Amino acid sequence: MRINGLYTPYWYRDVVDLLERASDRLDQIMIPKVGCAADVYAVDALATAIELAKGRHKPITFEVIIESAAGLTHVEEIAASSPRLVAMSLCAADFAASMGMQTTVIGGTQENYYMQHGENQYWSDPWHWAQAAIVAACRTHGVLPVDGSFGDFSDDTGYLSLIHISEPTRPY
């Protein structure tokens, strides 16, 4: 269940209401716009207190969404921030906005963002470096890296390409 971001006044009530009412039926909370480990600590401390007060038997787990330059800068400490953290993903649209990137397609390539080689233009992947940083932090700390969104529903080829490059590598 995705809660409101910690920059809003609503996240606290989201966590309290979810954990007090859902009992053990709820497995995971998705925390958006995580910018540093303290964001995860805040939700973890609140969740721990509620679980103890309510006698919850199954600890809730977290998936965090990296959506800002700050989040990517602190991705290593975020990945190590809590034993509840089991998954992490990148939100390309909000990340692009925080970076001041000119983007019109969520998760896809951008016009005029290419490498020129002679007469040929080769599209670059503007998200590769951010995704690679997230995957490295996740692999280091035993967290599952989850691919982010792809918002251009009219681009079947781009979507299939994203699926292909997102598949985990398999040993030969």
Language-model-detected regions and their locations in the chain:
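Active-site rim beta-loop-alpha module in soluble metabolic enzymes
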Residues: 137-153
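Active-site beta->alpha loop and helix N-cap motifs at the rims of alpha/beta catalytic domains
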Residues: 1-49, 67, 71
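Hydrophobic faces of well-ordered beta-strands that scaffold small-molecule active sites
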Residues: 1-3, 27-31, 60-66, 86-90, ...
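Short helix-capping segments at alpha-helix termini
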Residues: 22-25, 49-58, 142
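Conserved, mostly hydrophobic/aromatic
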Residues: 29, 78, 91, 134
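Active-site glycine- and acidic-residue-rich loops that bind
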Residues: 63-79, 120-127, 152-160
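Single conserved hydrophobic/aromatic residue that forms the stacking wall/gate
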Residues: 163-172
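Glycine-rich tight-turn/loop motif centered on a GG-T
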Residues: 100-125
